[in-house]
Each structure stands twice: as structure tokens, then as C-alpha cells.
């Protein structure tokens, strides 16, 4: 796949940003990990929702973990069997050792403080580009675009990309570069969350709700539809 920044020239980027941010203000989803700037808690949430549809029980498990293990030091000394039991309702009991290993690494390598550097954060076990960028963008407002399959789908549709989507868009440098260019300074958190929510609620893999999409007028996929 070959993409470059010129692909954005056909899009009114400032207007697209404004339309998405306006929509997010009234339609964005509400989760407790979005109400904190604690990088550790945001990181834990990202690990929980990685392979799990966000639903009420995820919120319950996250809340319980955040209260029982409020920092990396507490999680690093957790009883692994107890931790697995707390995760079993999500089918994530196998992640108990992974979470504990992550916490131990933060304690041993970074004195118990989640690093604020992208490369350092990605050096932690189980932390890839998506999680690292999400944590720093949502927690600190750093200018990183967040790309998962849902966000990549939006980019492909809006920009009219005809090539096959990469199997792991979160690691695709071209998509990451495009997203980094799209993210507005000062609204990094809201823009990334807005695209994530748009992909979950509106720009669905099948039968997307184009008629209610806030950025439909910027979208080449929408423009190609017979009744658009």
C-alpha cells in the first residue's frame, strides 16, 4: 500500500475536524477511563477493551481493578490467581499474568511511573502502537493519531482509498502519518475519541449509517452512493 500526505489535499481538513468534534460533544460515549488523566488507569482500560466489546461489565471490572490496584506497584504485587478471577467474567483470565508482567516492568524500568515517551511506552510488554498512542493522546493530549481497524475503515472511506486494508493498521506507518496530520493541536484527545466512537456507532463495517454521519459530506465513499 502506498499513500502520502497529498491524499489529504482533496479534503477540507479544518471543516472535517470541526464537524467531528461537534458531533463528539453530544454523541461521544462515556466511560470512567475517559474521565481520568492517570496514564496507568488508561493503560489498564486499553488492555481490557483490546479484544472485548465495551459493555457494562467491562466498566465494572475496570472500576474494581482501579480500586484494588490503584497504581503499578500495587498491581505488580497482586496475587495472580485473584487477578485472574477478577478478569474471568470477561474471558480475560489469561491476561492476569500479562497485566502483572506489565506492572512489574513499569516498576522495574520506570520506578513505578508510566513513561510519557512513545518509544519507552512501547517497550513495555504487551503495549503496541495503538495502546501507546491512545494512552498519550487521551491522557496527555499528545499529538498522536490513534489507528485501529475501525479508524482505518473511516480513513479508507473518507479518503476513497481503493487498496486492501492492511492486516494490522495500527502498525502501518502510512496510516499513522496520515492520522498524525489530521489530529488537531489542542483537541487531540477529543478528535481521536471522536473517530473511535464514530467507527463504533456510525461508520460500521456493514450497513454504515451514512445519513447520520457528521463527516459524510467529506467522504468519498458516501459521495459514491447512488442516493448521496
How would you describe each model-predicted region?
Residues 2-10, 27-227:
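Catalytic cores of DNA base-excision repair glycosylases
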Residues 13-21:
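Onset of an N-terminal alpha helix
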Amino acid at each position: 500500500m502506498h499513500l502520502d500526505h497529498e491524499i489529504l489535499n482533496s479534503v477540507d481538513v479544518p471543516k472535517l475536524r470541526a464537524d467531528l468534534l461537534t458531533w463528539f460533544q453530544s454523541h461521544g460515549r462515556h466511560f470512567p477511563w475517559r474521565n481520568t488523566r492517570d496514564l496507568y488507569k488508561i493503560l489498564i482500560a486499553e488492555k481490557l477493551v483490546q479484544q472485548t466489546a465495551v459493555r457494562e461489565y467491562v466498566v465494572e471490572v475496570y472500576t474494581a481493578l482501579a480500586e484494588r490496584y490503584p497504581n503499578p506497584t500495587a498491581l505488580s504485587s497482586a496475587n495472580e490467581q485473584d487477578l485472574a478471577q477478577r478478569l474471568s467474567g470477561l474471558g480475560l483470565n489469561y491476561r492476569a499474568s500479562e497485566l502483572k508482567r506489565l506492572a512489574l516492568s513499569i516498576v522495574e524500568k520506570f520506578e513505578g511511573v508510566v513513561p510519557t515517551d512513545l518509544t519507552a511506552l512501547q517497550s513495555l510488554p504487551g503495549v503496541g502502537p495503538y495502546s501507546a498512542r491512545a494512552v498519550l493522546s487521551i491522557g496527555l493530549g499528545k499529538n498522536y493519531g490513534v489507528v485501529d481497524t475501525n479508524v482505518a475503515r473511516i480513513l479508507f472511506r473518507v479518503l476513497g482509498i481503493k487498496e486492501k486494508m492492511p492486516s494490522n493498521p495500527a502498525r502501518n506507518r502510512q496510516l499513522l502519518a496520515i492520522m498524525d496530520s489530521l489530529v488537531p493541536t489542542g483537541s487531540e484527545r477529543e478528535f481521536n475519541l471522536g473517530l473511535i466512537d464514530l467507527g463504533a456507532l456510525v461508520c460500521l463495517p456493514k450497513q454504515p449509517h451514512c445519513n447520520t454521519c457528521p463527516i459524510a459530506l467529506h467522504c468519498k465513499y458516501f459521495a459514491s452512493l447512488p442516493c448521496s
